[in-house]
Structure formats: C-alpha cells, structure tokens
Amino acid sequence: HLVDLDLAFGRGTNTEVLSEVVAAVRAESARSSAPIRIQVSGGVRNAESLERALSLNPDRVNVTSAALADSSWLEDTLARYADSDLLALGLDARYISERGWVTVARGTDWSGPAVAEALAWLEGAGVRRYIVTDVSKDGSLAGPGAELLDVVLVQTDRPVVASGGVSSLADLVKLRSMVPYGLEGVVLGKALYVGNFSFEQALEVAGSR
C-alpha cells in the first residue's frame, strides 16, 4: 500500500520515488513464491492524478473520496473500469456533530456528502471495493475507526478494507471479528514503523480463524 502523501495534501507529488519503490517491489515479487500486489493511493481525484497513478503500473489504485466533488468524472471513470478490479474508492470521513459521518478530503477544508448518502450514490455508480479511513484516527495509533466501519459495512456488500489507527495485535483481533460482515483486510502503517508488532505477527493474527 503506497501513498503519495504530498499529492494527497496538495504539496506536489512523489511519483518518481514511488516508481522506484514499485520497481523494487516488482523485483522482489519475481523472486518470491507469493506475488506481491501493489496498491497506490493518495490524491487521486481527477484525470491527471489517475493517469499519474496508473503510470506506476499498480495492481490497484484508490480514488479518493474528494473525487465526489466532480461526480461526472468519477461516474465516467468507474464505468470505464467496471469490468476490472483496478479501482477502489478511498472513503475518507470524519464525524461532525451536526452532520454525523461526512466524507472529507485530506489537506483541504472540503467536506462532501454524508457517508450514507455518498455510499448510496457510489453503489449505483459501480464501486467494487472501499478503503475506509476515519481521518481522525489515521497515523494516531489510537485504534481503528470501528464506528465508521460499522456504518459502511451495514450499507454495502462490496469488500471493505480498514485503514488508519491500528496500534496493536488486539486491534487486529477486533477487526478480524468484522470479517463475517464484509471486512476484507486492513492497511497497516505506523504500527509497523514504530515496532509495535512485526508483519509476521500481524499475518499470524489475521490468518487465524
């Protein structure tokens, strides 16, 4: 899971660096008995940023929920890739007391429709998979956004991936309990970087039933 944070926050782009990382991962994957799939995310909200992400030749691209601001482009793009598993929708949201769960764009003041409203539209537009992030949890090691995940899982039968906030193996156990309700996986980041647990330990927890 590779994120162009500069693009996501409107500070430029890390395309060249990501290209080098993708090449290294592809080389490692060629030597591995299990292929390594690459998912690219961060700031993909229009034709230009999607083209930049696709130039990296990833297995999947996450289109940010900020693309809801241009619903015509998003609808056309989802239709173009309707028969492919190439695109996922990165559903970024924040809880606002007056409105409930609302879609947002990181690095901006933009807020879009309520999550329930956005999901109803996205389901009709043909989204095949959601990467769900409570932005107040992302990078915080404060635990996963279970409340937001509950809202999303109730409303869709598409695969859902949790992102942000995981700090411990106990968090993974909690997320694993959501698998019967449609949770497909989890994105790990800071917890691995700071050494809270190893990737091997995470796989052991996630793989047990």
Question: What are these model-derived regions, one by one?
Answer:
Residues 1-2, 36-42, 61-63, 87-91, ...:
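Hydrophobic faces of well-ordered beta-strands that scaffold small-molecule active sites
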Residues 1-17, 65, 131-141:
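Glycine-rich, proline-tolerant flexible connector loops at the mouths of alpha/beta enzymes
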Residues 10-39, 76-92, 143-168:
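Alpha-helix-loop-beta-strand connector modules within alpha/beta enzyme cores
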Residues 73-81, 176-179, 183-188, 192-209:
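C-terminal helical cap(s) of enzyme catalytic domains, especially alpha/beta-barrels
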Residues 54-138:
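Conserved anion-binding
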Residues 36-61, 147-182, 197, 202:
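Catalytic cores of alpha/beta
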Residues 18-22, 50, 71-78, 115-120, ...:
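Generic structural signal for well-ordered alpha-helices
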Residues 5, 43-45, 66, 92-96, ...:
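Active-site beta-loop-alpha junctions enriched in small/polar residues
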